Structure formats: structure tokens, C-alpha cells
């Protein structure tokens, strides 16, 4: 099965839970016999690196700014999918998952999975407009994804 991963900065993981999670998942999928492709950002993964532990890396340029980094890279990855023979597309994080509609439009019939790692809109680094966009993106992704995975549980308040 050909599985494409969108939304992470890249692998190998240098820091961050999303990248570590993706690296663990994709290398296990390769060991299970699947053909795996990870879209990477050149400001995170060296674009000369084409393969890592059996995983195919696809480096795409993006607008490397606080507000446009993830969404511009995700947009490019969705467009790139039109050239690919994907069996499954797996998005990671709320921001990138807001473009699931585009992947569904460009690759009809291909199952889309999304993994939410955290409620990004609760992070203090985002302003009101960015938080609104992330909340809308979360809602859209939950409605359009074929499967939704949540790997975090909110901490209990005692």
C-alpha cells in the first residue's frame, strides 16, 4: 500500500512530538511492507535526503513564516498528490488538516486519515484570527476525514 504523510515538518525527528510520532509510525509501516512517502519542509529536513530508513522523502518549498509555514507546505503537498498514486493520505495536526477538503477534491476516492496531536488553537503563540482558523480547520477535518485519530487526552483538573 502507498501511504502519503502530510503536515509534519519532516523526518528524521529533530524535536517535537508530531515529528517523532510520524517517524515511529512510518518506519513501522515500511517494516510491515508498505511504501511510505513523507512530505518534508526544506527548513527542517535537508532536501538532498531522499530516503530515510526506507521512507521516501518528498521535499517541497514553503513560505517559512510563523503563520504560513504549515499551511503553504500542506497546500503544495495536496497539489503534488495529483501526480502520485496514493492508496491512503494521512494528515497530521489541525492546521494542515484544514486542507483535507483540497486533498479530497484532487484525489477523489482516496481515504484520508487525520491525526490530531494537540488543540493548537489553545497555544498562546496564536492570535485571535489564527485561533479561529485553526478551530474552523479542526471542524472541517473532523467532518471530511474518513478516520480521525486523537493521540492526546486533556489533562485532568483536580
Model-derived features: positions:
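A short, charged, and often flexible helix/loop element on the N-terminal side
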Residues: 53-79, 123-130
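Membrane-proximal helix-turn-helix segments that form the acceptor-binding/catalytic region
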Residues: 79, 105, 131-148
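A short, histidine- and acid-enriched strand-loop-helix "catalytic/donor-clamping" loop
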Residues: 65-66, 97-98, 112-130, 144-147
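N-terminal strand-loop element at the rim of the active site
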Residues: 4-15, 21-22, 28-68, 154-158
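An aromatic- and histidine-rich active-site surface loop
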Residues: 71-80, 86-116, 120-121
